[in-house]
Amino acid sequence: MSKPTREEAKEAVRTLLKFIGEDPNREGLLKTPDRVINSYTEIFSGYGKDAQEILNTKFYDICNFQDLISLEGIKFTSFCEHHILPFNGTVHIAYIPDNCIIGVSKLARIVNIFARRLQIQEKMTLEIAESVQENLKPLGVAVKISALHSCMSMRGVMHDNSVMNTMYYTGIFAEQQKYRYEFLNLIAKR
């Protein structure tokens, strides 16, 4: 599949404006196609980034630390691949290192990469956990995402405050309940 030109993308926005009954030539909408393309370039910038590159900087043998490390409350906005409507929420990530750790900002950057793609929450949860697991090789990874979905509040069932939760565990978190409980108890205190 070849990528459309910027002009082709702008024409597609004009077509959508006509489809909803608007005049793309009226004053308030003249620059809308350009603005939409600029917004989409930023919003969907995760396609041009590789999680592995973010996780390449590792620290080995840092005080032999082998207990739970977590980053909680990572805010994100992503877009549902079914309706191209936003869903936003919070990600909590924990891992138990084996022989290396990463800088704390790297976990937030991983969330940004996957959130800035057309996405479903379940897949995003899995992608975050698996990218940390594959690149760090920790004893285990735990990820929980809680999000509000505009596709439920703006259309369809019209439920405003329904929160969807997804969790994914690898390694020791998947194998031993006590580690899952430790993670869930930690994030419950937020």
Curated annotation (Swiss-Prot):
It is an enzyme of class 3 (hydrolase). Keywords: GTP-binding, Hydrolase, Metal-binding, Nucleotide-binding, One-carbon metabolism, Zinc. InterPro entries: GTP-CH-I_C/QueF, GTP-CH-I_N, GTP_CycHdrlase_I, GTP_CycHdrlase_I_CS, GTP_CycHdrlase_I_dom. Pfam families: GTP_cyclohydroI. One of its GO terms (cellular component) is cytoplasm. It catalyses: GTP + H2O = 7,8-dihydroneopterin 3'-triphosphate + formate + H(+). Pathway: Cofactor biosynthesis; 7,8-dihydroneopterin triphosphate biosynthesis; 7,8-dihydroneopterin triphosphate from GTP: step 1/1. GO terms for biological process: one-carbon metabolic process; tetrahydrobiopterin biosynthetic process; tetrahydrofolate biosynthetic process. Zn(2+) binds at C80, H83, C151. Its EC number is 3.5.4.16. GO terms for molecular function: GTP binding; GTP cyclohydrolase I activity; zinc ion binding. Belongs to the GTP cyclohydrolase I family. Toroid-shaped homodecamer, composed of two pentamers of five dimers. NCBIfam families: folE, PRK09347.1-2, PRK09347.1-3. This is GTP cyclohydrolase 1. It comes from Rickettsia prowazekii (strain Madrid E).
